[in-house]
């Protein structure tokens, strides 16, 4: 008869951000354990609260299935000695499999005979196998750990109880000094201990003790209660998903309530109030039907509604203390001047090897002007960009950003406007941080986008120049994220962006005055290009671009990011075209022969000699390629792709009538030069020879 398994690990309160990953990890490890131990099952469901991680598995058989498997051993020539006796290798092999040499048979594999034995393993009872679940519990990993009592063992929090049931039977094992049983604990303040008579009682019995073990159920309770409170007051409520997830993992039995604060605090910017409520207190802000912030909030307690008025007062009191600080910081910051803040940045270190934040701003101002001119900003825009880049980090030394680092840029915009800066300048100060995540909001304005590019590229160029290149998962300065942001901005704006040329210009400009800019940019150019292309590969994968197209694009003799995007898009969109396969095959043949020409001739500057042509196909292809090359540099990737595809009939005719690798050295070299000319244009789109066409 099939039985249900219940495993619960009882802990002291875990940090909210650890709860969901740990629940998923436990579920995955239990599934792996069952699979490895040949125990079938129907469903696996995981549960978690701040005080527990649990898994319930249905329909586990009473015992493992008997297993009969064929095991391969050493080769016959190793298994037998010169006299035909079993060698030590053979004897050791059968002993390890629990059989004897009489069970050996020989079978041929790839022309070689090997020893094989059939190994029979009788299935153990499920209960006996499941006693090894202690290994699953101790194998869980966490971002931070602690040890307690006199144990060397480390875990996210001390383990206080373990429930392990197979239907109604306790599965006996220990973790440290904690022995498994059938008793769990209810809510820390509202519930009692609860004893399960059967594994399937888990959710219902704990709910009686004010513990909702299913995270999605707790989350829905919070959503329903919060929406009901907002509807009752005619408020607008947009539940922040990240905060909702956190609050769900802070409570075992959620009860939502409304709190209030004095309207005078509404004079402080909304972002400050919302951040105070969200980041410090885990409250949800509410707005009226015009979208204006209200002097109220919705919060969630870990418990029922008994004495809720005391809970509300306590939460309001704590929030008011936060808002008093915020109001004070805001009023003090308004007394500061931008120039005074910028001056302070001279004494704020960006990195000991790269200089101060002030020096970084000096570099970014220079880089921003180079980029701004390349992407076609107007003179007025360049002037606004100049001002923004001279002051854009000033808010880092304000009281408000010191208290709420997540408001950097946001407060910079607000303070800049208060001090009479142009809106375009203020907006750029806020937008230069964007995007803040792989899918985050991008800068909307051209000035903000250029400043964001300059700031991020300065970080990449500077850290690479002093040898601080991310390795493995180690990226303390978020250079991968910043580079990914650069690529996303370029894609969004569609700007021409020749990275190598830009980096060379920046290096030359910065290196003219190292004392002013704080760093010498003379290393890491090639590494930067490869680093950027690796992030491009990552972005293209998220867009479901074929792996061979990604390989072809990233390997291209091209470092203009906008053109690489265009190449990926055109190849992805045309991959199913009827003429794609023959066109790519023709161009690949050209590229492969051109590589031989490269080996033979190097980067020759000598031109093609039409007088050496021997047939009509050579002449027609030569004329068509010359016509194409005249406009190739000024046309779009899509236009150049179409032009190259249109060469296919001429290329086919060329190969039908022309032998390239002939004995006449002059003719051979002339033909290779002709193919190298075509290949150079093709490879500027992508390494088309890497495409897999069927």
From Swiss-Prot:
Known partners and oligomeric status: Tetramer of two alpha and two beta subunits.
Record-listed E.C. numbers: 6.1.1.14
Annotated protein name in UniProt: Glycine--tRNA ligase beta subunit
The organism's place on the tree of life at top rank: Bacteria
The UniProt record lists the keyword Aminoacyl-tRNA synthetase: yes
Location(s), subcellular: Cytoplasm
Pfam family, one: DALR_1
InterPro entries membership: DALR_anticod-bd, Gly-tRNA-synth_bsu, Gly-tRNA-synth_heterodimer
Catalytic class of the enzyme: ligase
MF term (GO), any: glycine-tRNA ligase activity
A GO CC term assigned to this protein in UniProt: cytosol
HAMAP family: Gly_tRNA_synth_beta (MF_00255)
Any one of the GO BP annotations: glycyl-tRNA aminoacylation
Stated family: Belongs to the class-II aminoacyl-tRNA synthetase family.
